[in-house]
Amino acid sequence: MKYRKLGKTGIEVSVLSFGASSFGGVFHEVNVDECIETLSTALDGGINFIDVSPAYGETLAETALGKALNGIRRGRYYLATKIGAYSEAKGDYDYSADRTERSLHASLKRLGVDFVDLIQCHDIEFADHDQIVNETLPELHSLKRQGLARFVGITGLPLKIFPSILDRVEPGTVDTILSFCHYELNDNSLVDLIPYLKEKGVGIINASPTGMGLLTARGIPDWHPASKTIIEGCRKAVEHCAAKGIDIVKLAVQYACSHPDIATTLVSTAHPKHIGDNIRYVEEPMDERLLSEVLALLQPILILISPEGALSIVTRSGVIELVRGFTTRTLFSC
């Protein structure tokens, strides 16, 4: 496993990291023993960064992860959780200082730890950015001073939300950003933001290397917001890889983990075999010829992508549906 520095935090994270959203039991009842085995496989394979949120399964993911972490030496992993988004289905978003404090304490109890390495404002496209700057981030830094978290981050889908916060706060206020669906085979729009983020000293966490199912043989869910052009283009890429006996997920994960300025890419699963496959993928050399062929097939899509990415959503209701589908169906998974 390779490791990269996460911004200016001073820590080095595995290029492939574990998203525990699947532990929320959305598709089926959570099997705690399987969760424990999955996490053990991830850690034994060199993964050292774990991300979760109280929103995933409405605290079920944190609870299951806490059971899986029980007995594991704290120094073996870096742990991240979030505040602000609690239930997409119920529209429960609250970025107030009071809820933020209560949420982190509750998360620590569920996770069975005394502190998290990273606490993140979750899906800040749903928040009043004045509140994020003037209330939420100051509260997170207060919790940091109390020793409950080491670093502070922000997460979201539209890329423009990151400068809208970072340009309003002092350097060092935000240590990391988490972006999803913007560095993958069919959408590399995150690349344009990387020089800015490096200048700000902010570490980059990437997620959803398969575009929420676009780059998989199983295809996408009904709610997926991608256009017919993007869906068809990705389908051709999937079929091209299959014709060569390759699961495109392998190439997608390898590509997502290949950028030297992106510290880590999250994948999620509750199956030991699947996380083992992903670890094996990043340890094997990428087929550069196949990559060139797939990127050529996807070029008509890439030139259509706006600065906000292929999954850019204009309306708030559209964003809510996308994020609701994403987080409740745990499609960080490959």
Language model: regions and residue ranges:
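Active-site mouth loops of central-metabolism enzymes
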Residues: 21-33, 86-99, 127
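Active-site groove signature of glycoside hydrolases
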Residues: 109-127
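Short, acidic/polar
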Residues: 29-42, 95-111, 158-167
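N-terminal binding-site loop/beta-alpha segment at the start of enzyme catalytic domains
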Residues: 1-77
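Low-acidity, Ser/Thr- and Arg-rich intrinsically disordered low-complexity segments
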Residues: 312, 317, 324-334
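Beta/alpha (TIM)-barrel catalytic core signal, keyed to glycine-rich beta->alpha loops juxtaposed to Asp/Glu
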Residues: 124-301
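Acidic (Asp/Glu)-rich catalytic clusters
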Residues: 8, 66-74, 109-112, 166-170, ...
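Conserved, mostly hydrophobic/aromatic
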Residues: 6, 18, 35, 50, ...
